Amino acid sequence: MMRALAVLLPLVFALAAVETAQAGVVVVMKTSKGDITIELDEAKAPISVKNFLSYVDAKFYDGTVFHRVIPGFMIQGGGLTPDMVEKPAKPPIRNEAGNGLKNNRGSIAMARMQELNSATSQFYINHVDNPNLDTMKYAVFGRVVKGIEVVDAIAAVPTGTIKGYADAPRQPITIVSVRRAETK
């Protein structure tokens, strides 16, 4: 009995350590439509996660809006005020597409211009699986673990062209705050 315990106990601790190591940083995005909990994958997207968290920690996203909403595609935010004015962002980061993470429903990825290494603060959350975005090298860095119904609600709002931005919600969908989740 003691010999079995001596073998099993280290195994239990080792498995617990692996589980802890695999858990990524979690953030809670409070929006005017509800909360979205997102797990970030530091192991596969360290540059994107570090960049995103630098904006989170600076409270940059507080008061910004989802400015591009396309049902059956994605919801995009993280850079514009409710008046559709772009906030000044930090320099762009290196693209981490091809890291094994896919643009599947509920994944969060860096929005960018045509230039591969042009992502700054803006991100999008996939409303559906979008494998074409993997081919186009859009870098995923996490996934929604709670609140996918909020993503669905945001994707369902009426949109139009507002101040030159197509697919903008007619009523602003505000990102109230994004914070690191409390660890237990």
Question: Where would I find each of the regions flagged by the language model?
Answer:
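Bacterial N-terminal signal peptides that target proteins for export
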Residues: 1-9
